[in-house]
Every structure is written in structure tokens, then in C-alpha cells.
A protein has these predicted regions:
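A Lys-centered signature of the CheY-like receiver
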Residues: 104
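Conserved two-component signaling phosphotransfer/partner-docking surface
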Residues: 87, 107-108
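Acidic catalytic/metal-coordinating carboxylates
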Residues: 32-36, 59-65
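Alpha4 helix (beta4-alpha4-beta5 surface) of REC/receiver domains from two-component response regulators
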Residues: 62, 85-100
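Charged docking surfaces used in two-component/phosphorelay signaling
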Residues: 15-23
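Acidic, metal-coordinating helix/loop segments flanking the phosphotransfer/catalytic sites
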Residues: 30-48
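Receiver (REC) domain active-site loop signature in two-component systems and cognate sites
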Residues: 55
Length: 108
């Protein structure tokens, strides 16, 4: 079974995302911030990371920058899911190693 780590400080977004991903057959783990997300990746590297940009403790861009230099950190597909919708943020995310960029809010 494919695994997805949701890294988002919003409990509501994590809940909605979990529902969508489980419906698609993913096993889901959650983290409330980037540091917690990196800790989860140390325990078990997921196949996919659904990542918010603005979070306390460690932002999404800090998370992906650190993830991509770790052993095995180049493997997960990383999808930013954020309210940041300007071209500069999208470019920065893709340059840091994101595979996709989705705008919030989203429907399921």
C-alpha cells in the first residue's frame, strides 16, 4: 500500500486530506509542522508528502529543503498544498524539489 504523509498545521485540512487519500487507497500519516514531518520521514520515508507552506516551528519550504538532502529524501513525491498562489512561491517550491503545487482551498 502506498503511504502519504500530510504535513499541515490545520487539523481540518489534515482530516479532509486524510479522507481523500484513504479513499484513494493510501495509508496516511500526519504531522503538524515541518519538524514533526521530518521526524516521521526518519521513522519511515513515505511515497508521497502533501505539504503546507506556512506552519509554525518549520515551514514547508524549510521541510522540503532538508528532506531532499537526506538519504532517501529524493524518493517521495512532494505536493505543496497551500494558500500561497503567486508565481514566486510556486517557482521557489519547484526549485526546492516539489513535484506539484496545488492551491487551497480544494474540494473533494
Amino acid at each position: 500500500m502506498k503511504t502519504c504523509l500530510i504535513v499541515d498545521d490545520s487539523r481540518v485540512i489534515r482530516k479532509v486530506s486524510r479522507h481523500i487519500l484513504e479513499t484513494l487507497g493510501f495509508q496516511v500519516e500526519e504531522a503538524e509542522n515541518g519538524q514533526e514531518g521530518l521526524d516521521r520521514c526518519t521513522e519511515a520515508m513515505p511515497d508521497v508528502v502533501l505539504l503546507d507552506w506556512n506552519m509554525p516551528v518549520m515551514t514547508g519550504i524549510e521541510f522540503i529543503t532538508q528532506l531532499r538532502v537526506r538519504e532517501g529524501g529524493d524518493k517521495p513525491k512532494v505536493v505543496f498544498c497551500t494558500t500561497e498562489n503567486d508565481v514566486a512561491h510556486i517557482r521557489e517550491a519547484i526549485s526546492a524539489g516539489a513535484d506539484e503545487y496545488v492551491m487551497k482551498p480544494f474540494d473533494h
